[in-house]
Amino acid sequence: MAGKRALVILAKGAEEMETVIPVDVMRRAGIAVTVAGLAGKEPVQCSREVMICPDSSLEDAHKQGPYDVVLLPGGLLGAQNLSESPAVKEVLKDQEGRKGLIAAICAGPTALLAHGIAYGSTVTTHPGAKDKMMAGDHYKYSEARVQKDGNVITSRGPGTSFEFALTIVEELMGAEVAAQVKAPLILKD
């Protein structure tokens, strides 16, 4: 199962934990993760003023695809920036078209709505993004901490970041690898 690749799209205002925890957990599982800056390779200021340095620009990272999963962190401003980006739309449409995994957390799923991705799926979001996500009846809503429906994995917020990341690992690498990664993290069951 070696050779799995992930693309995490980092926009100004992204939620730090929802970015770093999935990146860390996926890398622990042996997934090659590229953190791509929406606005280029310059450091990105996140929602709590933490700066994260992308590995690549989104433009360059997209050329290096395809990826096994494309992940969208949350954060209100971050999700808004993802939602307004034609480049994000192109990446998501490509991923959906090839039936690749798409993962989004917190307010991140609102970018799926903005770009017309995975209509008809059951999703979850941060409670504060629920009304926006459900406008137009394009999705079914779940209160689950992590929701998987077909090739779409969504989650609720910073406190669900580990579960979200481990669900992605299990999907890409299998339950055994997910369990091996989880054990030393000392997570509460």
From Swiss-Prot:
The gene is park7. Deglycase activity does not require glutathione as a cofactor, however, glycated glutathione constitutes a PARK7 substrate. Multifunctional protein with controversial molecular function which plays an important role in cell protection against oxidative stress and cell death acting as oxidative stress sensor and redox-sensitive chaperone and protease. It is involved in neuroprotective mechanisms like the stabilization of NFE2L2 and PINK1 proteins, male fertility as a positive regulator of androgen signaling pathway as well as cell growth and transformation through, for instance, the modulation of NF-kappa-B signaling pathway. GO terms for biological process: autophagy; cellular response to oxidative stress; detoxification of hydrogen peroxide; DNA repair; dopaminergic neuron differentiation; glucose homeostasis; glycolate biosynthetic process; glyoxal metabolic process. It catalyses: N(omega)-(1-hydroxy-2-oxopropyl)-L-arginyl-[protein] + H2O = lactate + L-arginyl-[protein] + H(+); N(6)-(1-hydroxy-2-oxopropyl)-L-lysyl-[protein] + H2O = lactate + L-lysyl-[protein] + H(+); S-(1-hydroxy-2-oxopropyl)-L-cysteinyl-[protein] + H2O = lactate + L-cysteinyl-[protein] + H(+); N(omega)-(1-hydroxy-2-oxoethyl)-L-arginyl-[protein] + H2O = L-arginyl-[protein] + glycolate + H(+). The active site is at 106 (nucleophile), 126. There is a cross-link at residue 130 (Glycyl lysine isopeptide (Lys-Gly) (interchain with G-Cter in SUMO)). Its EC number is 3.1.2.-, 3.5.1.-, 3.5.1.124. Keywords: Acetylation, Autophagy, Cell membrane, Chaperone, Copper, Cytoplasm, Endoplasmic reticulum, Fertilization, Hydrolase, Inflammatory response, Isopeptide bond, Lipoprotein, Membrane, Mitochondrion, Nucleus, Oxidation, Palmitate, Phosphoprotein, Protease, RNA-binding, Stress response, Tumor suppressor, Ubl conjugation, Zymogen. InterPro entries: Class_I_gatase-like, DJ-1, DJ-1/PfpI, Prot/Nucl_acid_deglycase. The modification Cysteine sulfinic acid (-SO2H) is found at residue 106. NCBIfam families: not_thiJ. The modification Phosphotyrosine is found at residue 67. GO terms for cellular component: cytoplasm; endoplasmic reticulum; membrane raft; mitochondrion; nucleus; plasma membrane. Signal peptide: none annotated. Larval brain and gut from 96 hours post-fertilization (hpf). Ubiquitous in adult; most abundant in brain, eye, heart and muscle. Within brain, neuronal expression is widespread, particularly in the cerebellum, medullary reticular formation and diencephalon. Expressed in major forebrain and diencephalic dopaminergic cell groups. PANTHER family: PARKINSON DISEASE PROTEIN 7 HOMOLOG (PTHR48094:SF12), PROTEIN/NUCLEIC ACID DEGLYCASE DJ-1-RELATED (PTHR48094). GO terms for molecular function: glyoxalase (glycolic acid-forming) activity; mRNA binding; oxidoreductase activity, acting on peroxide as acceptor; peptidase activity; protein homodimerization activity. It is a lipid-anchor. A lipid is attached at residues 46, 53, 106 (S-palmitoyl cysteine). It holds the Pfam family DJ-1_PfpI. Belongs to the peptidase C56 family. This is Parkinson disease protein 7 homolog. Disulfide bonds: none annotated. The modification N6-acetyllysine is found at residue 148. The lineage of its organism: Eukaryota, Metazoa, Chordata, Craniata, Vertebrata.
